[in-house]
């Protein structure tokens, strides 16, 4: 178990108070739910922060010693029938790193089929660690982060497309259709950007992203039964993505000599290669979803990091927040794999015919 001394507990709690104030915009007497998945010390720090903000706190522990395929019905029932004003899910996988990938499906279902369907502000922390809280991105200036995110979102309005290149070999264009909007986890206030009652974002905060999905009925080929599942709407992308830093669901830094290389045509994933056998589980997860539900994998998300306190750690929850980085995600049913691009150049093309370079070699130039 990761431990924290009393002085550090105060340090973390103070920052979580800022998060609740500036990002979730909570007030005294609001209700707050803490979901603790093997993160007792951070749950304690969050509980202290919530009480210091005058919130009414409830806590649910997810104690299973194996990965969840679906989270307990008592959690879903509480969220749907006694919806708190806000909450947080703390998922600490440092003792079982492989669970981060194997619980993705349950987390996707929780977020899109419960959290987004009720009026709640939800902080989502898959893979959170005490080190992030003490020494990393949770120690950011939340007021400044919210301001910066709003400014950058203004630069990402009325887009036609993005072009992303990087020294590692990434060269990809992404069309930004009218159905896709950019959002941020620096301000987690419902409703969602697409009008959903609830809104979620990560803690640690620190990105803007474009992503959209919908719940569809699809046949599970393994059981023959029809299921309601969240499936991403593709973003029309053409080109090559080279991930040479960090990949979602995998703990550890990627060997830049053996990167993940993904090829997209019209938004569909048409090829995925990697010489590092340690990363086979990522490819297997994508292939498993394709076979199980018979649907293609697509480019689901484009994200840009904003957090100056974030570091390269090999943990995607933190690494994708590094200021000046870019990440793109492959998505399918119960499958979401973020792939980080370091030191990108990003050029935006607007509908009025003008262009603007937003990032050059990993540095914002707005």
Regions found by a protein language model. Give the residues of each.
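Active-site lining segments that contact anionic ligands and/or coordinate catalytic metals
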Residues: 238, 257-259, 266, 297-301, ...
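Active-site bordering "gate/hinge" segments
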Residues: 1-240, 248, 350, 355-366
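Intrinsically disordered terminal and processing segments
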Residues: 325-366
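Glycine-rich, charged/polar anion/phosphate-binding loops
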Residues: 149, 158-160, 224-228, 244-251, ...
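Short solvent-exposed loop/turn micro-motifs enriched in small/polar/acidic residues
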Residues: 156-157, 234, 253-257, 321, ...
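Oxyanion-binding "anion nests"
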Residues: 227-281
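Short, glycine-/Ser/Thr-/acidic-enriched flexible segments
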Residues: 39, 94-96, 169, 179, ...
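Dual-mode signal for accessory low-complexity, basic/Gly-rich regions
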Residues: 255, 271-330
């Amino acid at each position: 178990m990761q431990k924290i001394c009393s002085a550090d507990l105060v340090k973390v709690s103070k920052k979580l108070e800022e998060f609740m104030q500036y990002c979730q915009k909570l007030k005294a007497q609001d209700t707050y739910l803490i979901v603790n998945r093997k993160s007792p010390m951070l749950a304690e720090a969050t509980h202290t922060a919530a009480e210091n903000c005058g919130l009414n706190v409830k806590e649910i522990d997810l104690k299973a010693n194996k990965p969840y395929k679906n989270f307990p019905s008592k959690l879903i029932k509480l969220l749907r029938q006694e919806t708190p004003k806000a909450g947080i899910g703390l998922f600490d996988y440092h003792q079982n790193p492989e669970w981060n990938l194997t619980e993705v499906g349950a987390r996707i279902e929780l977020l899109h089929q419960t959290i987004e369907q009720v009026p709640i502000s939800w902080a989502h922390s898959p893979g959170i660690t005490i080190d992030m809280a003490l020494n990393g991105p949770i120690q950011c200036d939340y007021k400044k982060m919210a301001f910066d995110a709003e400014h950058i979102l203004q630069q990402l309005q009325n887009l036609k497309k993005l072009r992303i290149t990087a020294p590692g070999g990434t060269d990809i264009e992404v069309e930004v259709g009218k159905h896709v909007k950019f959002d941020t986890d620096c301000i987690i206030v419902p409703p969602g950007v697409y009008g959903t009652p609830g809104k979620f974002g990560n803690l640690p905060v620190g990105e803007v992203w474009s992503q959209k999905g919908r719940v569809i009925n699809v046949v599970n080929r393994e059981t023959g039964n029809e299921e309601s599942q969240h499936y991403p709407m593709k973003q029309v992308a053409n080109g090559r993505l080279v991930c040479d830093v960090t990949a979602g669901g995998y703990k550890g830094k990627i060997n830049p000599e053996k990167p993940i290389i993904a090829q997209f045509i019209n938004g569909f994933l048409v090829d995925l290669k990697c010489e590092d056998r340690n990363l086979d589980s990522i490819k297997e997860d994508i292939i498993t979803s394709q076979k199980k539900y018979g649907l293609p994998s697509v480019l689901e998300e484009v994200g840009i990091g904003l957090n100056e306190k974030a570091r390269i750690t090999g943990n995607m929850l933190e690494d994708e927040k590094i200021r000046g980085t870019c990440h793109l995600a492959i998505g399918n049913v119960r499958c979401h794999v973020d792939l980080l691009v370091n030191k990108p150049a990003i050029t935006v093309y607007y509908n009025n015919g003008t262009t603007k370079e937003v990032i050059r070699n990993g540095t914002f130039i707005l």
